[in-house]
A protein has these predicted regions:
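Glycine- and aromatic-enriched membrane alpha-helices
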Residues: 2-456
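Positively charged, small/polar-rich N-terminal and surface patches that mediate targeting and assembly
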Residues: 417-424, 434-503
């Protein structure tokens, strides 16, 4: 071998290793999604959120092995729309492309996990498991095959539709599934209040830890370098992808900070975290095909778009999305896909390129409207397909095993009602009745006689007495000392969170 052959072999091996490292980074993004969703929701549902994110990957892995991958990568497509599944993963073990399987698997899991946040705090765990199986088994693989089939058999591939890392295939599909699910499921108890004049007021139900949300955001941003960069085939392209994957979310976050500062009087922390993710989603389709100016504009629009969409869904359409998943993933998945038709430079590193390595340029780079038209056609087709399929899936679940928990289960929290978990933070916030640190059962107070207590001298009545006291957290110490002074030494303490009946 001469020096060039040795260099080519080393480069090929290096990128093969990087490909698997990238897949590992994408897998680690599951932790980021779990932290974002947990932080943006209430503490009483934290364990349920973690469990759903875990099952997304584990159930999805089995479904993707059984059918999903073979359906997506079929060599025998009918009109470029749906493939006849192959069974190479079972029958051709020694020659099977395991690297590609692992990479596509973690992408599939990402699409599935987006829905968790939008349907958080009121979805039956069993119903969510069925959904997770359905999207990984058949919903995602079909549309992903339109764009990413290895044999080039997908109908959008043949049109040279560009989605390098999944703004459309992953994020708009996951976001559309989240939107459909949130609509069919309905809002959380106490989220919306209807006034006498018929107007509907949106009540803020805050998450329990902005710190966890921020941690999740940084984990996702870190993982996104593998998400976007793993498929790069040369170092120049990889560096460009990394740069665009930095520019777009940074710009989106700064623009969102300024926008919310002007609009609301103060910069919104939670919205800025979502803006970072929105910028990442938006640049994903064109990360290998746009330049710095394109990345700046894509990120700037994403920073405003996420806030506007979240506000419209909440205040105007009254669709309850606890973490803003629809605004982040669907809206910016659509925007990022269309933006390729505007800002693609006509050169780069993309799996949808022509045989000579080139592809259509965008409208603002001398390519005319052809690529823009292809991008719009592709995103509309993908989203319509996702909306129809997910409506069928969620309606089937709703009318069979049921999609939503009971009001009582929702109020006490998914952790205890679905998993028997007293609290994800058992050492800090007990959510089950306790006396002197020990869990106690519920007391039937229906037949208890009212008791009176003299402040001067506490006298035992021989009866249980239940008194409910609601106080501000900063006054709890005074309440506890006062109760002790009159002889009350044991009490159950529960942190009230939420709105209306939740408090």
């Amino acid at each position: 071998m001469d020096a060039n052959e040795i260099l080519d072999a080393a480069t090929s091996s290096s990128f093969a290793i990087w490909f698997l490292i990238g897949a590992s980074l994408v897998f680690f993004m599951q932790a980021g999604f779990a932290m974002v969703e947990t932080g943006f929701t209430r503490a009483k549902n934290a364990g349920n959120i973690i469990m759903k994110n875990l099952m997304d990957f584990c159930i999805g892995t089995i479904m993707y092995i059984v059918l999903g991958f073979g359906l997506m990568m079929s060599e025998d497509y009918v009109m470029g729309i749906i493939g006849i599944p192959n069974l190479d993963i079972f029958t051709n073990y020694s020659n099977f492309n395991w690297s590609q399987f692992v990479f596509q698997l973690v992408f599939c899991a990402t699409a599935a996990t987006i829905v968790s946040g939008a349907m958080a705090e009121r979805t039956k765990f069993s119903a969510y498991c069925v959904y997770s199986a359905a999207i990984s088994l058949i919903v995602y693989p079909i549309e992903a095959g339109w764009v990413w089939n290895y044999g080039g058999n997908g109908w959008l591939q043949k049109l040279h539709f560009v989605d390098f890392a999944g703004s459309a295939v992953i994020h708009s599909v996951g976001g559309m599934a989240a939107l459909v699910g949130a609509i069919i499921l309905g809002a959380r108890i106490g989220k919306y209040t209807k006034k006498a004049d018929g107007t509907i007021i949106s009540n803020a139900i805050g998450g329990h830890s902005i710190t966890l949300g921020a941690l999740g955001c940084f984990i996702l941003w870190f993982g996104w370098y593998g998400f976007n960069g793993a498929a790069a085939t040369n170092t120049d392209s990889l560096a460009s992808i990394f740069m665009n994957t930095t520019i777009a979310p940074a710009t989106a976050t700064v623009v969102c900070m300024i926008f919310t500062w002007i609009k609301d009087g103060k910069p919104d922390v939670g919205m800025c975290l979502n803006a970072s993710l929105a910028g990442l989603v938006a640049i994903t389709a064109g990360c290998a095909s746009v330049d710095t100016i394109g990345a700046l504009v894509i990120g700037a629009v994403a920073g405003i778009l996420v806030d506007v969409v979240v506000e419209v869904l909440d205040k105007k359409l009254h669709i309850d999305d606890p973490v803003g998943a629809v605004g982040v993933h669907w809206a910016n998945g659509v925007w990022g896909t269309i933006a390729v038709g505007l800002f693609a430079t006509g050169k780069g590193d993309t799996v949808q390129a022509f045989a000579d390595g080139s592809y259509y340029a965008g409208l603002f780079y001398g390519g005319g409207a052809k690529l823009l038209g292809i991008q719009i056609l592709g995103i509309v087709a993908i989203d319509v397909y996702a909306a129809i399929m997910m409506t069928i899936v969620f309606q089937l679940i709703k009318h069979t095993i049921g999609l939503r928990t009971t009001a009582e289960e929702e109020i006490i929290g998914m952790d205890i009602s679905e998993h028997g978990l007293a609290s994800a933070y058992a050492d800090f916030l007990p959510t089950t009745p306790s006396y002197m640190g020990e869990s106690v059962g519920a007391v039937d107070v229906a037949n208890l006689e009212p008791a009176t207590l003299s402040i001067g001298e506490a006298k035992p009545t021989g009866k249980y007495t239940k008194i409910t006291v609601i106080c501000n957290e900063d006054k709890f110490g005074i309440l506890k000392d006062t109760m002790a002074a009159i002889g009350v030494t044991g009490m159950t303490v529960i942190q009230a969170m939420g709105c209306g009946v939740e408090q």
